[in-house]
């Protein structure tokens, strides 16, 4: 585990470090910085949800307005994409939205860890959602669900080719869903570290360069605000695409 205060490499912030080693029968169940911050995000989600139920007032304060805004955004997303049938899936979609939002925002805290910056997490989450959505489709439509891969009126000669193309375009959703979140969070945090390192180098050099370090520092502050917006946007986009994919399965699009 790195003990120095200044991170020397822009990619060092993504290193998974074992905090508490633990294994059973050769299986590794160690607590890492990634799992630790994921647990923190889950506890924050539970805490936020409990406040939503028990700390409301007739005249909403600023904190209550934030809670209600996130709820309304998610509810509107579900209503626009799933309609009335989305009410059954709202608890899952709302939880997913909040979890990703907290994971992204926690990663903006200096010397924390961005769980969503690792493709292992985003791909695992996207694959789990994809499997669940397909199970819902099979449960809802039975074997008719597989008609998704064969549109009506297709000539028999091109059926094998079309099924292959439709199947590949269907499973690629897992990769687009996971890579989009992973790539945006990784690239944004890397850029922030590079600019922060550049500002620190200029300040350490002293003299005239120490004065001009305010330029990259101002740029860093501006990009930090932009990255905060991206953190919220990527959580929204991931959840929105989940709603769209779920609707495609329910309506056989």
Curated annotation (Swiss-Prot):
Keywords: ATP synthesis, CF(0), Hydrogen ion transport, Ion transport, Membrane, Mitochondrion, Mitochondrion inner membrane, Transmembrane, Transmembrane helix, Transport. It is found in: Mitochondrion inner membrane. PROSITE patterns: ATPASE_A (PS00449). Signal peptide: none annotated. Pfam families: ATP-synt_A. GO terms for cellular component: mitochondrial inner membrane; proton-transporting ATP synthase complex. Disulfide bonds: none annotated. Its main location: mitochondrion. It is a multi-pass membrane protein. GO terms for molecular function: proton-transporting ATP synthase activity, rotational mechanism. F-type ATPases have 2 components, CF(1) - the catalytic core - and CF(0) - the membrane proton channel. CF(1) has five subunits: alpha(3), beta(3), gamma(1), delta(1), epsilon(1). CF(0) has three main subunits: a, b and c. Belongs to the ATPase A chain family. PANTHER family: ATP SYNTHASE SUBUNIT A (PTHR11410:SF0). Mitochondrial membrane ATP synthase (F(1)F(0) ATP synthase or Complex V) produces ATP from ADP in the presence of a proton gradient across the membrane which is generated by electron transport complexes of the respiratory chain. F-type ATPases consist of two structural domains, F(1) - containing the extramembraneous catalytic core and F(0) - containing the membrane proton channel, linked together by a central stalk and a peripheral stalk. During catalysis, ATP synthesis in the catalytic domain of F(1) is coupled via a rotary mechanism of the central stalk subunits to proton translocation. HAMAP family: ATP_synth_a_bact. This is ATP synthase subunit a. It comes from Chondrus crispus (Carrageen Irish moss).
């Amino acid at each position: 585990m790195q003990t120095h205060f200044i991170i020397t490499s822009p990619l060092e912030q993504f290193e998974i470090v074992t905090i508490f080693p633990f294994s059973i029968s050769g299986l590794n169940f160690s607590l890492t910085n990634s799992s630790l911050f994921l647990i923190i995000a889950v506890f924050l989600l539970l805490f936020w949800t409990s406040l939503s139920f028990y700390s409301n007032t007739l005249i909403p304060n600023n904190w209550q307005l934030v809670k209600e805004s996130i709820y309304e955004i998610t509810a509107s997303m579900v209503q626009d994409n799933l309609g009335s049938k989305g009410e059954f899936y709202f608890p899952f979609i709302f939880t997913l939205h909040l979890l990703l939002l907290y994971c992204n925002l926690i990663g903006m805290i200096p010397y924390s860890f961005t769980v969503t910056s690792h493709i292992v997490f985003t791909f695992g989450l996207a694959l789990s959602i994809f499997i669940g959505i397909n199970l819902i489709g099979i449960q809802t439509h039975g074997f008719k669900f597989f008609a998704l891969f064969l549109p009506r009126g297709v000539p028999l000669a091109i059926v094998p080719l079309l099924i292959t193309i439709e199947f590949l375009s269907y499973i690629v959703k897992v990769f687009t869903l996971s890579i989009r979140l992973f790539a945006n969070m990784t690239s944004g945090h890397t850029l922030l570290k590079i600019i922060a390192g550049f500002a620190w180098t200029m300040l350490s050099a002293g003299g005239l360069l120490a004065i001009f370090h305010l330029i990259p520092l101002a740029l860093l502050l501006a990009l930090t605000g932009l990255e905060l917006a991206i953190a919220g946007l990527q959580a929204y986009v991931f959840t929105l695409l989940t709603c769209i994919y779920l609707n495609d399965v329910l309506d056989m699009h």
